[in-house]
């Protein structure tokens, strides 16, 4: 399960892509860009475990939020497959600076040493030649973003702030606010569940994520996301670490489907009208 697959902009982009508005899809950009410094140094919750990874690992530790929705749009595991990646990281500076500026003398956390690069950048190539940029950035001051850029021969969507340009619809060389197109291209699942999901976690996408899972189980139908998707998204973590540790050498992405990705039909969210 990946809740960001169900955020409203991501599902609208999925529908727009299915309708062909962006043309042939060629490139996507995504990531998890979130200033977590204060959270990482708390004496509770994530502060009890999250820094430990930064002491011994260097790579992209959290690709799923950004890559999940992009993989859906690009038909990964359902017509295309991740082929190989290269990854590199900046030096590690942000957590050390936070130590010096915010922790009192004598705090045991001041003695910790970190190896995680503050910004990790990964490029992925698919078997059909598409490219995906994935970023991980949680140790520096910045506003939140998952980027979510999807680009094709006829246009693109770019998130944070959410904006769209579609040739023949948008003014030449200008962005349109995504809200200007939402009435026409909003995903029907959001239209169905908007009131019921109001007030739920992360703007309602957590509710829709759970609703879709329960609906699949009750109806005995395949879930929107399966174990092969989970494996594909998760393996990015160790593969980026290997590439970073080996001068950004390319590393192949395993095919957990054993070739069945070429046979499986395109994703259509359960309960939504199929786009032909």
Model-derived regions, located:
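Non-transmembrane alpha-helical segments in soluble domains
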Residues: 14, 67, 71, 123, ...
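Short, small/polar residue-rich loop motifs at catalytic or cofactor-binding pockets
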Residues: 118
